[in-house]
Amino acid sequence: MEKLSNGVRDHCLISDYVSPSAPAPLKQPFVIGVAGGTASGKTTVCNMIMSQLHDQRVVLVNQDSFYHSLTKEKLNKVHEYNFDHPDAFNTEVLLSCMEKLRSGQPVNIPSYDFKIHQSIESSSPVNPGDVIILEGILVLNDPRVRDLMNMKIFVDTDADVRLSRRIQRDTVERGRNIQNVLEQYTKFVKPSFDEYIQPSMKYADIIIPRGGDNDVAIDLIVQHIRTKLCQHNLCKIYSNIFIISSTFQIKGMHTLIRDINTTKHDFVFYADRLIRLVVEHGLGHLPFTEKQITTPTGSVYTGVDFCKRLCGVSVIRSGESMENALRACCNGIKIGKILIHRENNDGRQLIYEKLPKDISSRHVFLLDPVLASGYSAVKAITLLLSKGVPESHIIFLNLIAAPQGIHALCKKFPMLKIVTSEIDSSLNEDSRVIPGLGEFADRYFGTNNINSKVSSLSTNLKLRS
């Protein structure tokens, strides 16, 4: 969607299907970086993605908008200026604008006039979108810019095709003659491509050959984006988080177990149902091999045979509530136990552990229904690693998780898989999950009534004395 008027490239364009005055999205946007050599078809790829995401608010940011304005001395020698070098861009302003868009703030992005080689301030703010596409030859070169992206794309097009497109674009749209274009290409464009642009291809998640002519690649990219847009923000950051598909039935069960007025009997019943779903989902992440069997009709059925070397490890007390569901799904499974004592807000002490002797050769389901700060989980996972369990063989199962706990685990153990049914908002000052469901173990095992009776008895004794 590249538009040029009097040599000025529009700094940021919003999908024609949505009004620019639409309110900013509440969820963190999905950021896509599209890089490639000059005239490789980056803009065409961006246009195709935007047209297929017509039901989403899409913002396109061009790296060309962030060129430095040239001084009089540089203007006099403009043909000696390398526009394809990283130093030609004002990356600090680019980073500032992208951070504001990602945080849901409107921002003024400059435009760049290629005829006078000056940056022009924008008078109208650009609102953020559900999807932000950052396009430019060097958007994958700077690690600070790469870190802002959820998906990185490199458009790979033949050098001869890129040169012919560049000649046509610069002569028709930017008022240059063919000789100057060829001189600039030989002196700056080609060397910069070899030194900076092509090496950045290694950072791309997806490489698109033939650019906009590759309809299959564009369709697959759009499908992936749509999937990510439906996910929680943390799932866009960490690929090892898996949330079971939310339905009205699952939402209804969450409503019941979170309700303070729910009886113990109902709490246990619906918690067990949710735990069973989480366990079943976790089993789907185990390795498998193809297996052929014969059915009672004499037909051959090609299916799969799941990993047999599996065990569970429950974090006492609340983790024990998940053992029955695991046993119901995996008959005869070995289950170990870990007891971790909380010393203070961020301290944990291992009190007890009893694990299968051959645990290092097994895949492990770590069981704890609530992931809060993540300190206990880190302690438990560290113990499993010390026993020789590969990090990639650990699947952490829980019902609800707080963002703080997810960050703590995923940053420390990137090969670990986390399977949960919902991600909650945050933690309060007492490190309890909000909105949460209270003390899970007390509600599940019925010990909250015992605690209240002990507290009441203690109060009565004090009053009598």
Swiss-Prot record:
Keywords: Allosteric enzyme, Glycosyltransferase, GTP-binding, Kinase, Multifunctional enzyme, Nucleotide-binding, Transferase. 5-phospho-alpha-D-ribose 1-diphosphate binds at residues 317, 342, 368, 373-376, 439. InterPro entries: P-loop_NTPase, PRibTrfase_dom, PRK/URK, PRTase-like, Uridine_kinase-like. CDD domains: PRTases_typeI, UMPK. GTP binds at residues 264, 273, 307-310, 362. PANTHER family: URIDINE KINASE. This is Uridine kinase-like protein 5. The gene is UKL5.
